Curated annotation (Swiss-Prot):
Top EC class for this record: transferase
Any single Gene Ontology cellular-component annotation: cytoplasm
Protein name (database record): Probable N-acetyltransferase YjcK
Gene this chain is encoded by: yjcK
Keyword Transferase: yes
Cross-referenced Pfam families: Acetyltransf_3
Record has Ribosomal protein as a keyword: no
Originating species: Bacillus subtilis (strain 168)
Family: Belongs to the acetyltransferase family. RimJ subfamily.
MF GO annotations: protein-N-terminal-alanine acetyltransferase activity
Length: 181
C-alpha cells in the first residue's frame, strides 16, 4: 500500500470488482471521452473479476501494475492508476494511465496518486522512464502530469483510436532522477 495525505493506493483485488464496476458505470460517459471502446463484459461484475484476476497475473510477471485509489477517510474506491506496457532490459520504461471519479476532479487527488505511483516505479521497480499520452483537449490530465513532474515531449499524431476516431496525443514523460547522476 502506498499512502498519501488524503488517499492511499494499492493493487486492485478481486474483492474490489463490485466497487470498481460502480465507479466505471457511474462515470461511463465521462471516462469514455478519453478511453478506448470497452468489451461488452466490461460493465459486469464477472467482467471486472476476470479483468482484476488478469491484472494480478500480470503484476506477478512484472508486466503491469493496476492500483485502486482509495480515500483515506472511508476506504472508498474513487479511481485507478496503472503502469502498463512495461519494458525491461535497456529501456526500463512504462506507460501510466488513470481514471478518477468526476466528483473528485480538481482536488489534487490524481496528482497525489500519480506521484505515489511514480515514486514506487522509480524506487521499487527501478524504472528509468514513465510516459503518458494525453488527448490535447484533456487539459486537466495534462495539468496532473505536469504537477507530478512530467514534461511535454511532442505530439504523437493519430496515435490511439478513441470512440472510433484516431486521436492525436500529447506525449509527456518523466525520468528517474536517480539515473541522472
Amino acid at each position: 500500500m502506498l499512502k498519501g495525505k488524503t488517499i492511499y493506493v494499492r493493487p486492485l483485488e478481486v474483492t474490489d470488482a463490485e466497487e470498481n464496476l460502480g465507479l466505471q458505470s457511474e462515470n461511463r460517459d465521462f471516462f469514455e471521452q478519453f478511453s478506448m471502446i470497452r468489451a461488452d463484459d466490461y460493465y459486469t461484475v464477472e467482467g471486472q473479476r476476470k479483468r482484476i484476476t488478469e491484472y494480478q497475473e500480470r503484476l506477478e510477471k512484472d508486466e503491469e501494475y493496476h492500483f485502486g485509489i482509495f480515500t483515506a477517510s472511508d476506504d472508498r474506491l474513487i479511481g485507478t492508476v496503472s503502469l502498463f506496457q512495461i519494458i525491461r532490459g535497456a529501456l526500463q520504461t512504462a506507460f501510466i494511465g488513470y481514471f478518477l471519479d468526476k466528483a473528485h476532479n480538481g482536488k489534487g487527488i490524481m496528482t497525489e496518486a500519480v506521484r505515489l505511483v511514480v515514486d514506487y516505479a522509480f524506487h521499487e521497480l527501478k524504472l528509468h522512464r514513465i510516459e503518458a499520452g494525453v488527448m490535447p483537449r484533456n487539459l486537466g490530465s495534462m495539468r496532473v502530469l505536469e504537477k507530478a513532474g512530467f514534461h511535454k515531449e511532442g505530439i504523437a499524431r493519430k496515435n490511439v483510436k478513441i470512440n472510433g476516431v484516431w486521436e492525436d496525443h500529447q506525449v509527456l514523460a518523466i525520468l528517474n532522477p536517480d539515473d541522472e547522476q
